[in-house]
Amino acid sequence: MKKDRLIAAAVIGLMLCLCAVGITRAQEPAGSGVPAHLLVTVEPRHGSNVPVINREDVMVYEGHDRDTVTEWVPAQGDRAALELFILLDDGSSISLGSQLEDIRQFMSAQPASTKIGVAYMEDGTAHVEQNLTSDHAQATKALRLPKGIGGINASPYFSLSDLVKRWPASEARREVLMVSDGIDRYYGSGDLEDPYLTEAIDNAVRAGIVVSAIYTPGVGHFGHSYWQTYWGQIYLSQLAEMTGGEAYYIGFTGAPVSFSPYLDELQHRLTHQYWLTFLAKPPKKAGWQKVRLATEVPNVDLISAGRVYLPAAQ
């Protein structure tokens, strides 16, 4: 009996050791996989002080599995290049005119490493008034009053997809500041199943383009309809959240008093971004893979798109 108890105890002890090893290995990052890339914004939870985040502070998860982080580089110095498109809705109310000076000042304040383009959403396309340029003064001249014709831009998400698809690949950060009411007049329904919004998000994330948005009302009935402006801002928020950007002004009806606070916050975000590369698990079929970023550094969040598109395993 004593011998049997000793054998049983030894077996149980071995099983516990194997379980512990399995748990430890599950918590360790995988050492191989497909390189995947994200542009990450470091955002303080309280106040405005952003702590320095080092590579060893960053954790990337696919489900419960932790991936290996191979690169975490500040978007500064020789990696600071930024291509920024200002995308404005030509169906906006004339109230947008009072915000153009704020946008001009924001554009003029950009560093020399930033190229700026200006486009207007019209008939489902992005009509480029100014191609990307390092001449910020020249870019500001492309700003104009919106045409303010109801329905001129049936779906702002058609225009965003058009811009993304025509944007040449680049080693620089690529970001969009979208100014619109967000209302999809082409889709019509107010729900979370808008296929044109979904397609625009997919296109932006696959291209590595971050989209931020500021709400401004459109003309006509939709400019003061609580129902329509509610869904328009929900769509803009979803777009920004899914691409790693930020959406501003949940006011539902009426125009923001000023764009300045939102543009100041956007500028703060642009100066605290990092290039992240990690090794993702190769899927059996090419497709989307959800990822989650985490850090043990207090008072900070890591903001990015929540998924990456991966090729099939070879």
Language-model region placement:
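Scaffold/interface architecture of coatomer-like assemblies
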Residues: 26-314
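Bacterial N-terminal signal peptides
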Residues: 9-20
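N-terminal secretory signal peptides that target proteins for export/translocation
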Residues: 1-4
